[in-house]
Design a protein with these regions (language model features):
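Very long, low-complexity or repeat-rich scaffold/adaptor subunits
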Residues: 5, 43, 143-146, 154-161, ...
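Alpha-solenoid helical repeat scaffolds
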Residues: 1-101, 110-141, 198-223
């Protein structure tokens, strides 16, 4: 069924399928949060395991990454909502492929529709991306992404401009924008291993250091 989510295979079915996936991720995320509560009434044997969560995200990841580039705005919004929920469930499975597509699209601005879709998706996922507690490798990408998005402010393309401004606004409301290169480390917490993607890990100290280095030119944004 993945072919039905491909942007070039557009039809009314895309909206229905994207909405179906959106409802699936909503119900799944709601159940995950409910089972984390101390007063959860679901028996332990019936609760969602980490393996089930991982398989759920892997199953729906590809179709959402395809439909986020749909030419139909409702389909795109539904896919972004699904990706956002899954990014909080398993950020190491969702954010790396989104970032890979984002950098490749923003570095080649010839495809306007694809660029707009990427920027709006980044705006939707910005909270997960800039939160070290969610995805430790995310903050180091913030400054490069902001600079790559600047050409998105285009008076001849209102939708792309709106998406770019929403990304900048969302980031500005989520983090304090400043030069953090002189900030200290977290001591013993820096040795904690954190996932980068599906196969690789790093230390929190290394990711925090990379994030601090990436903010060397952030004073321009906070002035």
């Amino acid at each position: 069924t993945e072919t039905y989510f491909h942007p070039s295979n557009w039809g009314l079915w895309q909206v229905q399928l994207a909405n179906f996936v959106q409802h699936l991720t909503w119900e799944f995320a709601r159940r995950c949060k409910a089972e984390e509560r101390a007063d959860c009434a679901t028996p332990a044997a019936w609760r969602l395991t980490l393996a089930i969560r991982r398989e759920f995200v892997l199953t729906l990841r590809t179709v959402c990454l395809l439909s986020m580039f749909s030419k139909e705005p409702i389909t795109t919004l539904a896919s972004q909502s699904s990706l956002k929920r899954m990014a909080f469930l398993h950020p190491e499975l969702i954010l790396p492929p989104v970032l890979e597509r984002s950098f490749s699209s923003l570095e080649a601005l010839e495809t306007t529709q694809r660029t707009t879709a990427v920027i709006s998706t980044l705006a939707a996922l910005s909270q997960a991306l800039v939160s070290p507690g969610v995805y430790a490798a995310g903050p180091k990408h913030l400054a490069p992404l902001l600079y790559l998005c600047l050409p998105g402010i285009d008076l001849n393309d209102p939708m792309k401009t709106l998406s770019t401004c929403m990304l900048i606004l969302s980031v500005s409301l989520s983090v304090y924008v400043a030069d953090g290169t002189s900030a200290g480390d977290d001591g013993d917490a820096g040795a904690t291993l954190v996932p980068l993607d599906d196969a690789n890990v790093s230390s929190r100290g290394a990711e925090d250091y990379a994030a601090r280095l990436s903010t060397a030119e952030m004073d321009v944004w906070s002035g």
